[in-house]
């Protein structure tokens, strides 16, 4: 198969391939970018594979950076762009089901492609637009099928994260997993416990943000892979609820909303501990737990002005988005009205601060000072007090009166 036109991302990188070939080596576009252009999807990263060894690659170009030279990768700075160029390689026995004990550089494109995870990711493209397909990836692409390269059992024993990648690609590409590949994923799912939580989180997160995320979750359920992921053991019912409780065309607005609703569906009692088990950042934990708290408030009643002040319009909108997807009552107009009615959106908007209370009222730093500032803040938010220096001073004076 030959491309009639090369996408602009590849055209810009063609001089890189030309230089490498003029130096006497082979060079191809490889991986996800080739797959995506054939599927007419947006291209993100342009990856180049070459028969030149790292030191040979560096000798060809003036500006290079060693970003992963032990694995054969050199970053080339050329034509205003950055390109990762990786030497064809084979990988020795894998350690802990996640990383090769040794990487060997080779001159053969086929040897390089045969170590990849799925056939649709094992395609290469030359400078003339000719697709190189050694493992029937084009047929799988046409039939929307995800199939492991070579023996599926070996691919998942080498790196068990490929199981999570399989779920993610099913979700992002809307592909069905080929039977033998699926069975190998199912039988090797216990190996997911050997994978770093951070790597599993990245794949699960991408799955949740994919347009066909239900397909990825359904495959995970069928494989019983969830039993080997943090906080998901014996959570088949909760994951099924996640799939069926939202409208068919619903996709999550952002990562916070997705993970919040996962925990809502699973009825997680301690969201922070759940997210800690996934080794997420403190900021991520803080935002998602607040989002769940606001969702639960909304289950009980309509939003009030204080809710919008404390949680923000954006977070309230994410909650309403989830409610709409469940065919529950939604009131975005109320959120906008309450937000517009707020005199302040943050305590730093208050014209008087702790320093004024210490200087003008002789208050001492400590709990009493903090409590007074909270009273001022609440009174302003609720509309009982103007955000005016003189008015606030009078309010404080009255509060301090014996």
Swiss-Prot record:
Organism encoding this protein: Streptococcus pyogenes serotype M5 (strain Manfredo)
Sections of the chain in a coiled coil: none
EC number: 2.7.7.72
Domain of life per record: Bacteria
Binding site for ATP: 32, 35, 116, 159, 162, 165, 168
Broadest EC class assigned to this enzyme: transferase
HAMAP family documented for this protein: CCA_bact_type3
UniProt entry tagged with the keyword Metal-binding: yes
Protein name: CCA-adding enzyme
Keyword ATP-binding among record annotations: yes
Misc remark: A single active site specifically recognizes both ATP and CTP and is responsible for their addition.
């Amino acid at each position: 198969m030959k491309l009639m036109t090369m996408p602009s991302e590849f055209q810009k990188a063609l001089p890189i391939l030309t230089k490498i070939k003029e130096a006497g080596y082979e060079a191809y576009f490889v991986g996800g970018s080739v797959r995506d252009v054939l599927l007419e999807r947006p291209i993100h990263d342009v990856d180049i594979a070459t028969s030149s060894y790292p030191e040979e690659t560096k000798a060809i170009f003036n500006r290079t950076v060693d970003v992963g030279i032990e694995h054969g990768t050199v970053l080339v700075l050329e034509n205003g762009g950055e390109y990762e160029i990786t030497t064809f390689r084979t990988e020795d026995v894998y350690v802990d089901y996640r990383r090769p004990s040794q990487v060997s550089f080779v001159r053969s494109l086929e040897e390089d492609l045969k170590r990849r995870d799925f056939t649709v990711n094992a395609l290469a493209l030359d400078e003339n637009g000719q697709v190189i397909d050694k493992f029937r990836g084009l047929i799988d692409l046409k039939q929307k099928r995800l199939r492991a390269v070579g023996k599926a059992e070996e691919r998942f024993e080498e790196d068990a994260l490929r199981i999570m990648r399989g779920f993610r690609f099913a979700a992002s590409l809307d592909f069905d997993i080929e039977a033998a590949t699926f069975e190998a994923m199912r039988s090797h799912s216990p190996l997911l416990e050997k994978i770093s939580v951070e790597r599993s989180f990245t794949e699960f997160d991408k799955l949740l943000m994919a347009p066909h995320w239900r397909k990825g979750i359904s495959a995970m359920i069928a494989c019983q892979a969830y039993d080997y992921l943090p906080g998901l053991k014996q959570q088949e019912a909760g994951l099924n609820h996640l799939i069926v409780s939202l409208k068919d065309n619903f996709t999550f607005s952002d990562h916070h909303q997705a993970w919040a609703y996962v925990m809502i569906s699973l009825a997680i009692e301690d969201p922070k501990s759940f997210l800690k088990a996934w080794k997420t950042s403190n900021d991520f934990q803080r935002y998602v737990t607040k989002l769940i708290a606001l969702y639960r408030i909304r289950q009980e009643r309509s939003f009030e002005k204080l809710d919008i002040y404390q949680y923000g319009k954006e977070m309230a909108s994410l909650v309403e988005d989830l409610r709409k997807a469940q065919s529950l009552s939604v009131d975005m107009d109320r959120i906008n009205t309450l937000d517009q009615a707020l005199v302040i959106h943050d305590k730093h908007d208050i014209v008087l601060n702790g320093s004024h209370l210490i200087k003008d009222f002789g208050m001492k730093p400590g709990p009493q000072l903090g409590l007074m500032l909270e009273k001022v803040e609440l009174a302003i938010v609720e509309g009982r007090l103007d955000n005016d220096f003189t008015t606030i001073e009078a309010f404080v004076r009255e509060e301090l009166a014996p």
